[in-house]
Design a protein with these regions (language model features):
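Short, Lys/Arg-rich, polar N-terminal cytosolic tail immediately upstream
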Residues: 1-23
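Internal alpha-helical transmembrane segments of multi-pass membrane proteins
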Residues: 23, 27, 56, 80-101
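Hydrophobic alpha-helical transmembrane segments
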Residues: 24-32, 65-69, 94-98, 119-123
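Membrane-water interface at the C-terminal end of transmembrane alpha helices
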Residues: 26-30, 127-142
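Transmembrane alpha-helical segments of multi-pass membrane transport proteins and ion-pumping complexes
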Residues: 34-46, 72-80, 109, 129-134
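Membrane interfacial helix motifs at helix-loop boundaries and amphipathic/re-entrant anchors
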Residues: 40-69, 106-123
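Membrane-interface elements of multi-pass transporters and channels
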Residues: 44-56, 84-89, 138-142
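Core segments of alpha-helical transmembrane spans in multipass integral membrane proteins
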Residues: 61-81, 95-105
């Protein structure tokens, strides 16, 4: 007697027995790329004379990278939760991501006193979102 077992859709093993984690890999790669891009934009803006300071405190370049990567990880966790417990995960993730992008831009618009810093902070948010959201949305269940 022969028994055929269909491969699991949630865990795909390779020939070496290792498990594939496409959402984890996508989250890390998108987070690193977005963090580098946001930091580069901040560095270019600072070199061009944008103060990048809030209440007299300079925003460290590492802060751009850290917070961007944290945002990517949170996005990956949201996709994982939606894939597990929700129907139409992709659509719901896109709505949640759009709302979080808007909310995350509020301090960028309200805190810095100068327009150049505000524009730079919003630009880094939008650039990071443009990199992270499509990558994670592709990993969300349709």
């Amino acid at each position: 007697m022969t028994v055929t077992v269909a491969p699991s859709a949630t865990s795909i093993g390779s020939t070496t027995g290792r498990r594939s984690h496409p959402l984890l890999k996508a989250t890390v790669v998108a987070g690193l790329v977005a963090a580098a891009a946001a930091t580069a934009v901040a560095a270019v803006a600072h070199a061009a004379g944008v103060p990048l300071a809030i209440d007299g405190e300079q925003i460290p370049f590492l802060g751009f990278a850290q917070m961007t990567f944290v945002g990517a990880v949170l996005g990956g966790l949201i996709v994982a939760a939606l894939n597990r417990w929700s129907g139409r995960a992709r659509q719901r993730f896109q709505v949640i991501a759009a709302a979080l992008i808007v909310v995350s831009c509020v301090p960028s618009v309200s805190l810095p006193p100068d327009t150049a810093t505000k524009l730079t902070l919003v630009a880094t948010h939008l650039l990071a979102a443009a990199i992270i959201v499509p990558v994670l949305a592709r990993r969300a269940a349709p």
